[in-house]
Amino acid sequence: MQKITKDSKCIIFDWDGTLVSCEQLVHASYVLTFLKMGNDKAFTWSEADTHAQNGKSRQTIFSDTTIWGTNTKEAEEIFYQVYPRLQQNDSVLFQLYQDVTGKQLQPLMVYEGAKEFLHYLKIQKPNRPIVLLGAKNEELLRKEVFEAGLIQYFNRIIGNTVHADANKPSPKAFDRAVVNYHISDKSSVCYIGDNPQKDMAFAQSWGATGFILTPEKLREIAQFLPQQVSHKTIPFVACLSTPHING
């Protein structure tokens, strides 16, 4: 198994599902966007439907007429009005979501072990950059990281911009993540995500070394950290996996 060692030149993290859980907020944004548009999908759109959009770019999602019909631009505008309010735990929208779905909405949750893992990577090699590479609007992503209390661990936060071809899941997003870091060997860049298919294919598309990290594995890390003794390699690397991706 490949390991994250002190020789790794840069570590890049996925956000949603890897370090935090905010899929409920994303799902609620879909539901409330449909509701605002008078679309009956507000009552039928499932969490599985939301999950199926994971890994897609903003441009891809909001050009999909099978989801939004012909009002894709309106949907995008409403969605990005709703999501920031949910980020701020807007009680009116939380209640509206509960009225529509019958479910109580959970706010952003930082996974157990996430902060400890980031802290360890930081002290293992203080000058090695740690980057967050997400698929959200960059301003929203930065706000979320700040609210989660994790912003101090990242040298750079990369989210979606208006340039669709440079956004995740395009491999060009990696170029934005490592710009000016003088990376000569792409395999020395570690990309850590939660999706064995999409995240690992994303890493492979650029040449980074991909690792899978789940909430369960983070909990293992949190339990192990008090026993760590070595800074040469991450002793809890066995909690991570590097699945083979068929090209």
Regions found by a protein language model. Name each.
Residues 149-160, 222-244:
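Structural recognition of alpha->loop->beta junctions
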Residues 109, 131, 136-190, 197-201, ...:
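Substrate-recognition "cap/lid" segment bordering the active-site pocket of phosphatases
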Residues 4-6, 124-128, 181-187:
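Glycine-rich phosphate-binding loop signature in dinucleotide/nucleotide-binding domains
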Residues 190-224:
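Acidic, Mg2+-coordinating phosphoryl-transfer loop and its flanking beta/alpha structural elements
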Residues 4-112, 123:
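N-terminal helical cap/lid subdomain that shapes the substrate entry/recognition surface
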Residues 39, 126-128, 208:
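Short glycine/serine/threonine/alanine-rich loop segments
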Residues 25, 70, 112-113, 136-137, ...:
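Short beta->alpha linker loops
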Residues 33, 117-128:
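A short, Lys/Arg-enriched amphipathic alpha-helix followed by its capping loop at the start of a domain
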